[in-house]
């Protein structure tokens, strides 16, 4: 059975392979080409272009692009039903005398399409309707020859393994979430249980950066490409009266990753605001600056930005006496790299450098590219907007589909990198489960460390002491 190539090979620098579409489909009604590039088409024609026949198999770039973006216009199970129908029609329309021969020719192509779908978008098949259609079509193929039976079995086993791994991962996330508590609550009830800080758990900033990279890559790995589209699907564009967002919004892994970013920011702020002594707070700031710098060197831009965000939170940034004891030159450089001006120009330049390094990498470490995720989401949001708008003639704007697919396929390449660093369970456990302060608790800790400087801060301090500590 043909193996699918890596995602990095799917798109050239211009966004897609420009010589893929010189096929019999060029004259197909409902598709519009320019210089052999597919620019637009009716939804029905695009679906037909996805389905193989005896003389044709769609390019993998097209398969990925259409399976990714078509969900802006229809449910995946609706697309699967249409694909099944067209495959059966192709078989029926063939000469009855050569029916078995035709099936023998088309079966491996249909099986390859199903394999690509189940490998790249396995989460689609958590829907029972999808799985039912898949099994029906797979049964048709398997009833032919022994070879196909084995390949169908292999495809189904691989899919079931992926879905089982996802369920297991979600259970772990749910367990972590259910046991998470506010640090102030724990301090008031069991103060002896939080006597450690991050430096006592891991005194080496380089090791901490590596463990953060473990968490980032694990969480990235479970994000399905379709989540980038489904996150922005509000309702079915073909049915203006009925919202289907609740059914289609399957973006748990993407949301869990965004929550991780927020947790890391609050963890950094908590660790800085906790120490009673000024020199210990200054030491903690310098420690996180070194962690952030190593994250930058690794190519872990998401942890880097989360650390900078935590250090820039008001409860931390207002600690002027603490910051006065910190050597900030390294921090200034990192802030400059992640400066949001000119649409994050400096960061985007650094990201391109890391992506280029990844392409020519000689080691797993050089392959690591972990983008600043919130910005990636923002970029993809605007691409989704363009994809969802049909052209005046009712055609789907496939040129926009290409742009979206290129961005997501690059992400797919990055998320498949294996983390080369040794895991430290003790450090990972601390990073994922140690209680952190809420925003109010951070302000209270900050005011307790360095007193209020004006009437507004004094009033807030009194209010927080009263509400959080029951003191006046």
From Swiss-Prot:
It is found in: Early endosome; Late endosome; Midbody. GO terms for biological process: Ras protein signal transduction. It comes from the Eukaryota. Residues 204-452 form the Ras-GEF domain. It holds the Pfam family RasGEF_N. SMART domains: RasGEF, RasGEFN. GO terms for molecular function: guanyl-nucleotide exchange factor activity. SUPFAM superfamilies: Ras GEF (SSF48366). The keyword Signal does not apply. One of its GO terms (cellular component) is early endosome. Its main location: other. Interacts with CCDC124 during cytokinesis. Interacts with Ras family proteins. Guanine nucleotide exchange factor (GEF) with specificity for RAP2A, it doesn't seems to activate other Ras family proteins (in vitro). This is Ras-GEF domain-containing family member 1B. It comes from Pongo abelii (Sumatran orangutan).
């Amino acid at each position: 059975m043909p193996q699918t190539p890596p995602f990095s090979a799917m798109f050239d620098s211009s966004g897609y392979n420009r010589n893929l579409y010189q096929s019999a489909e060029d004259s197909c009604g409902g598709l519009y080409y320019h210089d052999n590039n597919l620019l637009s088409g009716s939804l029905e024609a695009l679906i037909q272009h996805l389905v193989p026949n005896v003389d044709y198999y769609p390019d993998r770039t097209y398969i990925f692009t259409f399976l990714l973006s078509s969900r802006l216009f229809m449910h995946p199970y609706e697309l699967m039903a249409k694909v099944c129908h067209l495959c059966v029609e192709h078989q029926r329309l063939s000469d009855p005398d050569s029916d078995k021969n035709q099936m023998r020719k088309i079966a491996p192509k249909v099986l390859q399409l199903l394999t690509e779908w189940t490998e790249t978008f396995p989460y689609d098949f958590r829907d029972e309707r999808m799985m039912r259609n898949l099994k029906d079509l797979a049964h048709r193929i398997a009833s032919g020859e022994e070879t196909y039976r084995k390949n169908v079995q292999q495809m189904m086993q691989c899919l079931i393994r992926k879905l089982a791994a996802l369920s297991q991962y979600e259970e772990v996330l749910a367990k972590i979430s259910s046991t998470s508590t506010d640090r102030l609550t724990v301090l008031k009830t069991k103060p002896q249980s939080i006597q450690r800080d991050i430096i006592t758990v891991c005194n080496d900033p380089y090791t901490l950066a590596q463990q953060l990279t473990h968490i980032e890559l694990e969480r990235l790995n479970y994000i399905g490409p379709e989540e980038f589209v489904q996150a922005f699907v509000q309702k079915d564009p073909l049915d203006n009266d009925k919202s289907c967002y609740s059914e289609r919004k399957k973006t748990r892994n993407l949301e869990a990753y965004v929550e991780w970013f927020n947790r890391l920011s609050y963890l950094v702020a908590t660790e800085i605001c906790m120490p009673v002594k000024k020199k210990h707070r200054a030491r903690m700031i310098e420690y996180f600056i070194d962690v952030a710098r190593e994250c930058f060197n690794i190519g872990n831009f998401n942890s880097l930005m989360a650390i900078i965000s935590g250090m820039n939170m008001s409860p931390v940034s207002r600690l002027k006496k603490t910051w006065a004891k910190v050597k900030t030159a390294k921090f200034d450089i990192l802030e400059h790299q992640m400066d949001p001006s000119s649409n994050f120009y400096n960061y985007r330049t650094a990201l391109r450098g890391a992506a280029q390094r990844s392409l020519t990498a000689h080691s797993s470490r050089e392959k690591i590219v972990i983008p600043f995720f919130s910005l990636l989401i923002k970029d993809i949001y605007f691409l989704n907007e363009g994809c969802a708008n049909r052209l005046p003639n009712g055609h789907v704007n496939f040129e926009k589909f290409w742009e979206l697919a290129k961005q997501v396929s690059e992400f797919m390449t990055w998320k498949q990198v294996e983390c080369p660093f040794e895991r430290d369970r003790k450090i990972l456990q601390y990073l994922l489960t140690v209680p952190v302060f809420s925003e109010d608790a951070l302000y209270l800790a900050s005011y307790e460390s360095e007193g209020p400087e004006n009437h507004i801060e004094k009033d807030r301090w009194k209010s927080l002491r009263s509400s959080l500590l029951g003191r006046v």
